[in-house]
UniProtKB/Swiss-Prot annotation:
Protein name: S-adenosylmethionine:tRNA ribosyltransferase-isomerase
Listed EC numbers: 2.4.99.17
Localization in the cell: Cytoplasm
Quaternary structure (record): Monomer.
SUPFAM superfamilies registered for this protein in UniProt: QueA-like
Role this protein plays: Transfers and isomerizes the ribose moiety from AdoMet to the 7-aminomethyl group of 7-deazaguanine (preQ1-tRNA) to give epoxyqueuosine (oQ-tRNA).
Primary location recorded for the protein, binned into one broad class: cytoplasm
Gene that this polypeptide is encoded by: queA
Family indicated by similarity: Belongs to the QueA family.
Domain of life: Bacteria
An example Gene Ontology molecular-function term: S-adenosylmethionine:tRNA ribosyltransferase-isomerase activity
Keyword set includes Ubl conjugation: no
């Protein structure tokens, strides 16, 4: 079935892009979409507690956003900007580099105040090895900036270090926020536990490819970027138990969806550690996930394709049109949907 990327386009008024977070995490709005009937209803995010039951399992991604934007220069003084993509070891890392002229393999360049050597280049990705005493973790800690997405059109500010991070973030490695999780305050997490709803954590480190628009006309010929995930054995046990007892597996965010569906590709959820480049678009089957919380996604993105696979493209486009008419806030710092 030929599916055009343009079929996942929609017109969004620019003023609905949320460049700043609300004062309180859980003060956002929640659009509830029944994927069977297409019924849409408007709620506050704190109402989510009423949509879940004891016996349900919520699966969160506990990846932590790195202070991945760094600056530096060539030995000539020419300015460089880095977006750290993946850390191999404390002195060795993959990074994007923004420069007037690309640094050559074998050359030495500065990452902030520390010298590094360009070991390799693959497409737009460089492999750097730090020559000085500091490691990449120290450099990020001392100089790093939160890598806000380009559509926010602003530099990061002090509050972003906290607000572009979930309250349960633990495992450092993402270059973008786990946006569905940003709505969960510590109070709401406590209410969920008090209600007898079970919680589990997987890890998927979001790469910068998450911002990459689909550039081919035919959806199926798009090549997904690979990201590192971990779905531990105890999470698989909880999922099997939940299903056996008639509860629902509810994922918080598309990263949790992609992780669980990778681990459940053979129809049975199994522990998984490694890379995934799973691409979920209409026609693909979901073996694990019963419901999800997710933000509103960019036009023509792989993420709007994922939610369209879960709930049917026409229903998603209708829900987005409703959200625009009702002045919902879009993207990373925006409002959320509950699709069930």
């Amino acid at each position: 079935m030929f599916m055009k990327t343009d079929d996942f386009d929609y017109k969004l008024p620019e003023e609905l892009i949320a460049s700043y977070p609300l004062e309180n995490r859980d003060a956002s709005r929640l659009l509830k979409l029944n994927k069977q009937t297409g019924e849409i209803a408007d709620y506050k995010f704190t109402d989510f507690i009423d949509f879940i039951n004891p016996g349900d399992l919520l699966v969160f991604n506990n990846s932590k956003v790195m202070l991945a934007r760094l600056y530096g220069s060539k030995t000539t003084g020419a300015k460089l900007e880095y977006l750290i993509e993946r850390i191999k070891n404390p002195k060795l890392f993959e990074t994007h580099i923004k420069a007037n002229r690309s640094p050559a393999i074998g050359s030495e360049i500065y990452v902030e105040d520390t010298l590094a050597k360009v070991l390799d280049k693959d497409g737009g990705m460089y492999l750097l090895e730090i020559q000085g005493d500091k490691d990449i973790y120290q450099l990020m800690e001392e100089f790093g900036h939160i890598p806000l997405p380009p559509y926010m059109k602003r530099d990061d500010e002090e509050f972003d270090a906290e607000r572009y991070q979930t309250v349960y973030a633990q495992d450092l490695g993402s270059v973008a926020a786990l946006t569905a999780g940003l709505h969960f305050s510590k109070e709401l997490m406590q209410q969920i536990k008090d209600k007898g709803v079970d919680i589990a954590y997987i890890t998927l480190h979001v790469g910068s490819g998450t911002f990459k628009p689909v550039q081919v006309d035919d959806v199926e010929s798009h090549k997904m970027h690979a990201e590192v995930i971990s779905v531990p054995v105890e999470v698989c046990q909880k999922i099997r138990q939940t299903k056996e007892n008639g509860g629902r597996v509810i994922t918080i965010g598309t990263t949790s969806v992609r992780s669980l569906e990778t681990a459940g590709q053979n129809g049975q959820i199994e522990p998984y550690q490694g890379e995934t480049d799973i691409f979920l678009y209409p026609g693909k089957k979901f073996n694990v996930v019963d419901a999800m919380i997710t933000n509103f996604h960019l036009p023509k993105s792989t993420l709007i394709m994922l939610v369209s696979a879960f709930a049917d493209k026409e229903k998603i486009i209708k829900a987005y049109e409703h959200a625009i008419a009702e002045r919902y806030r879009f993207f990373s710092y925006g409002d959320a949907m509950f699709i069930f």
